[in-house]
Amino acid sequence: IHCFNAADNAPLMSEWSMEEADRLLDQARDCGINAFTITGGEPLVNKNGDDFARRIKDMGYLVKLDTNGTFPDKMQSLIDAWLVDYVAMDIKNSPEKYAETVGLEKFDMEPIYESMRLLMGGKTDFEFRTTVVRELHSAEDFEKIGAWLKGDEKYFLQNFTDSEFVLQKGLGSHSRETLRSFADIVRKNVPNVEIRGI
């Protein structure tokens, strides 16, 4: 097991064997923990993701999956096997600005659309969420995101937090007032909008 969430300069980075992960799961149960989040980077790039999720579920834990939506088939496999109880999927930006937001010249949106369809038409509880970055997100973007997500889904705006481990330096967060205005824009199409991180 390896955490892809931290930057290369993050402290204490190491890979764990499945035996070490099992010990952690046992210790967590002894501490009264009843749920785990499988996160990353993108955890579905891990070829052992199904096995790890099954181990967690077999030990009686609830499982949340954090995903960017780029692997709809793998996500569907976990859902069909009842290995996840909740999915949080990132919506990086409006479709027109996805490539720019993820740092690519071109980006294939079809896996994102497919993951959204699977969640919206599926049996697992889920949320969509956007980490809001001052340099990347505007009111116009949230007009487009609201129209794109239109429906009763849960949608969260998360304020960006800078740190020494963020790969791209110089990014900033929006003010509380601006985040609230973005939430109001999205609520015209998605009533269930909340803000995190303020």
Question: Language model features by range: what are they?
Answer:
Residues 1-18:
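Canonical Radical SAM [4Fe-4S] cluster-binding loop centered on the CxxxCxxC motif
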Residues 180-198:
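A C-terminal junction/extension of Radical SAM enzymes
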Residues 25-35, 44-176:
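Conserved AdoMet/S-adenosylmethionine-binding subsite of the radical SAM
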Residues 41:
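Short, charge-patterned binding micro-sites
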